[in-house]
């Protein structure tokens, strides 16, 4: 079993920075990352970089000449491809910043504790154990899926991560939740050309922000054609051949692809 001064579980911002710093001080380091799509962490792969790349492209679409929906759909597909190429480039650079360091070994697999000083890494080739004087957990978090009837069975329900892989521009997109992430995606897809409806279960949007800020944000988004339904409690989601319907207490909305 190979021994290291430090084993870091999670190739995110904190983990990669710590690994490089420890290696610079002559520590031997093992970096364990479950997914080869997450080298570098959230910001590079599923957060800041891809969202801002798409927002930039969406802004160009909104500022240009009027386009048919078919033209917008083609442009959106090109924008997703451009975003993916950028993310792939940055992910590769992040990987090699650590993997090319002689004092760092990168393991692509799921890490778990075999003992207080031992990490078992499950890879496609099997499971191996590595030891560390220090073990650092830098695993981040996963998306919370609300317990809404039919949501797990729907083929057209996306998270803020999975929707950025969607290559078909929705004609109508329903966003459940009026927090800052939901509103960021609402603005983006409205600029690309989708009809967007935001459903917020509470009495106001972005409740942690000052009310004048929230009012200004809502006004700006409504000018883009975004529809808001405040106090809308989603009871269930159901699919037809081409549409996912979001059922509210007294209303029904459609998300069209």
Locations of regions flagged by a protein language model:
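Hydrophobic patch in the ABC ATPase nucleotide-binding domain
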Residues: 104, 178, 226
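Rossmann-like NAD(P)H-binding beta-loop-alpha module
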Residues: 168-201
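Beta1/beta-strand and adjacent pyrophosphate-binding region of the FAD-binding site
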Residues: 2-12, 171-176
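Glycine-rich flavin
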Residues: 2-4, 21-27, 33-169, 197, ...
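N-terminal Rossmann-like FAD-binding beta1-loop-alpha1 element of flavoenzymes
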Residues: 6-27, 185-190
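Flavin (primarily FAD) cofactor-binding/catalytic cores of flavoenzymes
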Residues: 232-234
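Conserved phosphate-binding and hydrolysis motifs of nucleotide-dependent enzymes
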Residues: 10-15, 140, 177-182, 252
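Conserved small/polar residues in nucleotide/adenosyl-binding loops
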Residues: 246-253
């Amino acid at each position: 079993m190979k021994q290291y001064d430090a084993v870091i579980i999670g190739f995110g911002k904190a983990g990669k920075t710590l690994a490089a710093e420890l290696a610079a001080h002559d520590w031997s380091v093992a970096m364990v990352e479950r997914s080869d799509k997450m080298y570098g962490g959230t910001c590079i792969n599923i957060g800041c970089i891809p969202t801002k790349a798409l927002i930039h492209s969406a802004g160009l679409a909104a500022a240009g000449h009027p386009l048919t929906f078919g033209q917008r759909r083609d442009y959106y597909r090109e924008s997703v491809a451009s975003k993916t190429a950028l993310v792939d480039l940055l992910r590769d650079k992040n990987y090699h910043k650590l993997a090319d360091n002689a004092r760092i070994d990168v393991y692509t697999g799921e890490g778990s504790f075999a003992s207080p000083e031992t990490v078992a890494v499950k890879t496609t080739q099997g499971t191996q154990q590595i030891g560390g004087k220090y073990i650092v957990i830098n695993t981040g978090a996963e998306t919370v899926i609300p317990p809404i009837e039919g949501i797990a069975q729907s083929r057209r329900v996306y998270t803020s991560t999975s929707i950025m892989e969607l290559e078909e521009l929705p004609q109508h997109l329903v966003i459940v939740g009026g927090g800052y992430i939901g509103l960021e995606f609402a603005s983006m897809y409205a600029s690309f050309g989708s009809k967007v409806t935001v459903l917020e279960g509470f009495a106001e949007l972005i409740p942690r922000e000052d009310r004048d800020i929230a009012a200004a944000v809502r006004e700006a988004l409504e000018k883009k054609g975004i529809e808001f339904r405040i106090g809308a409690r989603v009871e269930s989601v159901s699919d037809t051949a081409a549409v996912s319907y979001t059922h509210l207490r007294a209303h029904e909305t459609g998300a069209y692809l």
